[in-house]
UniProtKB/Swiss-Prot annotation:
Family: Belongs to the anion channel-forming bestrophin (TC 1.A.46) family. Calcium-sensitive chloride channel subfamily.
Bilayer-crossing regions: 29-49, 77-97, 235-255, 267-287
Keyword Ion transport found: yes
Protein's name in the database: Bestrophin homolog 22
Subunit and interaction comment: Forms oligomers.
The species this protein was found in: Caenorhabditis elegans
Swiss-Prot/TrEMBL keywords: Cell membrane, Chloride, Chloride channel, Ion channel, Ion transport, Membrane, Transmembrane, Transmembrane helix, Transport
């Protein structure tokens, strides 16, 4: 099950930090707590034996072991270096596996758009194309994911679930391919597309090739999943990492003991090695990241939702091909006509507007936005000049005679540029974003009474906003989107117009 915590980290504050930290499922606490408890118990057991059961001479020998094991331990086993490379490699591999699990939306949209026809035969073809792709995905995933294998333990369960018919299962059983049969349903899909083109349901070979390419892209993703399952990370690599981390903390069981006797005792005797326990939490948790991501198709908390992907692809794909299509002559192909009907084409709300101002709620409008504007675009380098002189570079001037040099000399008047720049800067200072928003808030605060259908005092807000703007728009060529004008109760409209 994939653990979602995105909403918890939507803001960088202490509340988000604690919301993230206090989770249990999929957390570092769940992954490490049991091993940390065992390690701490063994550490305390060794400490008790050292303190109370060993003779003074044995304690001297044990203290020599403590110094020996703790000497240059971090340098001899560089866990940060080892884990950094390994986890980066595993995360990149995990991302490729995630991208290989295909969504059927693109292919379904092409089926619905390019395979024309509202008759039952065409509808069956479009739906079967979706089903064949989902069947291919299920066949692949049930061989590489325990989630899907438990859901479909036999081929009969695939037929019982509706992903294939018993006739199709018989065909699969009689295919003489000792390696795989994943390609079979893909081949059925390609054959159906070709038959549709021959029957005129697909208008051209170009459109047929577009559909074929999309099916091929879906198949390529499934093939990449099989390759990642077939060729895992070389066994030596995870063995070295996992063994190094555990050996490190086995050595720490002795090397991090507090020396309580002898000429050089530890400066402080805490019994529990707090810093080493923090190291255990960090390094072991870091290693658990790699362990969880080595096979993201398993059954851990953070593994991918393979069964959900199959369900989503089947339901969404069938919905797309069977509801979002319209025939030119005979009407709509689905009972849910309102879903298949293309909306009437009307002018959008921003028609004829020079300055478009998309709307925000008052709360979200307070958030500053960093626009895509060059960092040097607002700098005026000719502020105190009337003109600038343009000339070739000195390296080129040396190649020209004096008469040719004069022909390249240009004088550029920058007075208009400076005037426009000064005007723009003045407008920005007079109409700062915070000041304008504050004015809008003071005008509208406590004045709205909005009904459930989006109207205010029984009047549609959109219509009233357009009515208020009419007089302003006719006198100002640089129109502002009418919806950006505040809507006020009738008693304030006259006052508002003066602003």
């Amino acid at each position: 099950m994939t653990i979602s915590y995105t909403l918890d980290v939507s803001q960088t504050n202490l509340q988000s930090f604690f919301s993230l930290l206090l989770r249990w499922r999929g957390s570092v606490w769940k992954a490490v707590f049991g091993q940390l408890a065992v390690w701490t118990a063994v550490f305390l057991l060794i400490s008790c034996i050292y303190r109370y059961m060993l003779s003074p001479s044995q304690q001297d020998v044990f203290e020599q072991l403590i110094r020996y094991f703790d000497n240059k331990l971090d340098a001899n086993i560089p866990l940060t270096f080892l884990l950094g490379f390994f986890v980066s490699f595993v995360v990149a591999r995990w991302g490729s596996i995630l991208n290989g699990i295909g969504w059927i939306d693109d292919a379904s949209l092409l089926f619905a758009t390019y395979i024309r026809g509202a008759d039952e035969e065409t509808r069956v073809i479009r739906r079967n194309l979706v089903r064949y792709l989902v069947l291919s995905q299920a066949l692949v995933l049930r061989d590489i994911s325990m989630q899907v294998r438990k859901r479909f333990p036999t081929m009969d369960t695939l037929a019982a679930s509706g992903l294939m018919t018993h006739e199709e299962m018989d065909i699969l059983d009689h295919i003489k391919d000792p390696y795989s049969r994943y390609w079979t349903s893909i081949q059925w899909s390609l054959n159906l597309v070709y038959e549709c083109q021959k029957k005129g349901k697909v208008d051209s070979y170009y459109l047929m090739n577009k559909i074929v390419d999309e099916i091929g892209k879906f198949r390529h993703g499934l093939a990449s999943l099989l390759k990642y399952d077939w060729v895992p990370v070389p066994l030596v690599y995870p063995q070295v990492i996992f063994l190094a981390v555990r050996i490190y903390f086995m050595i720490c069981l002795i090397g991090r003991q507090f020396i309580v006797t002898g000429p050089n005792p530890s400066g402080i005797d805490l019994w529990l090695p707090i810093t080493t326990m923090v190291q255990f939490l960090v390094y072991m948790g870091w290693m658990k990241v790699a362990e969880a991501l080595l096979n993201p198709l398993g059954e851990d908390d953070d593994d991918l939702e393979c069964n959900y992907i199959i369900d989503k692809n089947l339901i969404t794909g069938l919905s797309i091909v069977d509801t979002m299509w319209k025939h030119d002559d005979t009407g709509y192909s689905m009972v849910e006509e309102h879903m298949a009907k293309t909306p009437a084409q009307k002018k959008d709300e921003f028609w004829g507007i020079d300055k478009i101002a998309p709307l925000y709620s008052m709360e979200s409008a307070e958030r500053s936005v960093h626009p895509l504007v060059g960092s040097a675009s607002k700098i005026n380098l000719v502020k105190n000049k009337k003109e600038i002189v343009m000339t070739p570079h000195k390296n080129k001037l040396s190649e020209l005679d004096p008469s040719e040099q004069k022909t390249y000399l240009r004088r550029v008047n920058v007075s208009d540029h400076n005037a426009k720049h000064a005007k723009q800067r003045g407008l920005e200072r007079a109409n700062s974003p915070d000041k304008c928003l504050s004015k809008m808030r003071s005008r509208s605060n406590g004045k709205f009474r909005t009904s459930a259908n989006g109207s205010q005092n029984g009047v549609d807000l959109w219509t009233r906003a357009g009515d208020i703007e009419m007089n302003v728009a006719t006198s100002n060529p640089n129109q502002v989107h009418p919806h950006s004008i505040a809507v006020f109760p009738p008693e304030e409209q006259q006052t508002t117009s003066r602003h």
